[in-house]
Amino acid sequence: MIDPNLLRNNLAEVAEKLKVKRNFMLDTEKLTALEDQRKNLQVTTENLQAERNARSKAIGAAKARGEDIAPLLAEMDDMGNQLTEAKAQLDAVLAEINQIALSIPNLPADEVPLGKDDTENKEILRWGTPRTFDFEVKDHITLGEEANGLDFAAGAKLAGARFAVMKGQIAKMHRALAQFMLDLHTEQHGYLETYVPYLVNHATLYGTGQLPKFGEDLFHTLALEGEQPYALIPTAEVPVTNLVRDVIIDEAELPIKMTAHTPCFRSEAGSYGRDTRGLIRMHQFDKVEMVQIVDPDKSMEALEELTGHAEKVLQLLNLPYRKVLLCTGDMGFGSCKTYDLEVWVPAQNTYREISSCSNMWDFQARRMQARCKAKGDKKTRLVHTLNGSGLAVGRTLVAVLENYQNADGSITVPEELRPYMGGLDVIGK
C-alpha cells in the first residue's frame, strides 16, 4: 500500500506515474469525491462529539441544580443517534478508500527502466559460459525419466496436470539442493532458518499483497465449522514477512534476515499453455526463500546484498546465469525494484528465471503496520521489506540435470552437492 498522504496531497502526480509506469488507471474523480466525503464526515463527527460532550457537562450541572433534565436527555439521545449514523457513514467511506488503496501497485524506483513487458528488461551482467556439448542434449524430462527419478504420469494420476513424483537419486538431489541452499544462507549469509505454516489466514495474505488483487492465483480451503478460511502459501515470503506484522522493532535489531524452505502452491491462472511439460511451472514446487526486514534508509543496499546471496548459489553450483533489472511493466505488484536471475537451460537454449529478488520499500510494511523505533525516540517509522528466491529448488534441479548431463545419459553431481548425497559423484545410468 502506498503512502495515503501521497494520494491526498499529490493525487494527480501519483495517478500520472501509475499510468505511465504501471499502466494502472487510478480513478481520481472517485477518490477525490470519497476524500471530500471523508473530510466532511470527519468534521461532522468531531463537531457532534464535541457538542455531545458539552451537553453532557450541562446536564450534570442542571441536575446538580435540581432542574428537570428530561428534555436535555432527549436531545442527547437524538445527538447520539446522529453521531452513530455519522460514524457509520465515515467508516463506510474509509473502507471504500481502503479498498481502492489496496488495489494500487507500488510506485517503481526512479532507476527502474520504463517498459511494457519482459522484452524491455535491462540485462545487468552474465556469469559463466554455457557449456558446449559434443552430443545431442537431452531435456530434464528425458534425463529424469531415464534415471527412473521423474514420474509425471504418476503425478497426473495422483493430482492432475502440473504435478510430478520424484524418486531415488533424483529425489535425493532435490533434497540435497534445498539443504545446500539453507546451509549457505544460514552459515555464510547470516539468515535465521525459520519453519512456518503452509496454510495462512487472509490477514497474512493482505499483509504481503496477495489479497485482495490476486486471490485467483491461490489455492483456497473451505472454512471448517468454527474456523476461518485458509489459503496455501504461494511462497514462504508470505508467512515469513508477516512475522513482523503489528510489531515495533528496536532499530538496533535491524536488519532481520530469515530464510525458509517450503513447498509453494500456485494455481498458475493465466499460464494456460505455457511450460505444460516438465518441472518449470508446477502447481506445487519447493523454494528456499530469503526475507530481510531493514532500516528504511538501507533497503537499496540490502537489495544488492540479497541478490548477491542468490547469485552465490548459482556460482557455487557453476551454473551460468544472467542478472536482469525488471522494467516497470514486468515488475510484481508490490515491488519498487526487482532483479531476476535467469539460469541457462541447455535443452531450451535460453535463460529461464530461477530467482526474483525484490525491494518492496514500505509497501508491505504499511499493510502490516511493521515499524521500527530508535532507542529513546517516541516516533516510529515503517520498516522496509525485501524478499528473494534463494533458489527455486525444482528449477535448480532442472538446471543441474541439463548442464551436468553426460553422453550416456548419466548426470555428474556438482561438487558442492556430493557431501549431501553420500559422496555420490554420478547419478542416473
Swiss-Prot record:
GO terms for cellular component: cytoplasm. Keywords: Aminoacyl-tRNA synthetase, ATP-binding, Cytoplasm, Ligase, Nucleotide-binding, Protein biosynthesis. It is an enzyme of class 6 (ligase). It catalyses: tRNA(Ser) + L-serine + ATP = L-seryl-tRNA(Ser) + AMP + diphosphate + H(+); tRNA(Sec) + L-serine + ATP = L-seryl-tRNA(Sec) + AMP + diphosphate + H(+). Signal peptide: none annotated. One of its GO terms (biological process) is selenocysteine biosynthetic process. GO terms for molecular function: ATP binding; serine-tRNA ligase activity. InterPro entries: aa-tRNA-synt_IIb, aa-tRNA-synth_II, aa-tRNA-synth_II/BPL/LPL, Ser-tRNA-ligase_type_1, Ser-tRNA-synth_1_N, SerRS_1_N_sf, SerRS_core, tRNA-bd_arm. It comes from the Bacteria. Its EC number is 6.1.1.11. Pathway: Aminoacyl-tRNA biosynthesis; selenocysteinyl-tRNA(Sec) biosynthesis; L-seryl-tRNA(Sec) from L-serine and tRNA(Sec): step 1/1. Transmembrane segments: none annotated. It is found in: Cytoplasm. ATP binds at residues 266-268, 353-356. Homodimer. The tRNA molecule binds across the dimer. NCBIfam families: serS. Belongs to the class-II aminoacyl-tRNA synthetase family. Type-1 seryl-tRNA synthetase subfamily. Consists of two distinct domains, a catalytic core and a N-terminal extension that is involved in tRNA binding. Catalyzes the attachment of serine to tRNA(Ser). Is also able to aminoacylate tRNA(Sec) with serine, to form the misacylated tRNA L-seryl-tRNA(Sec), which will be further converted into selenocysteinyl-tRNA(Sec). This is Serine--tRNA ligase. It comes from Haemophilus influenzae (strain ATCC 51907 / DSM 11121 / KW20 / Rd).
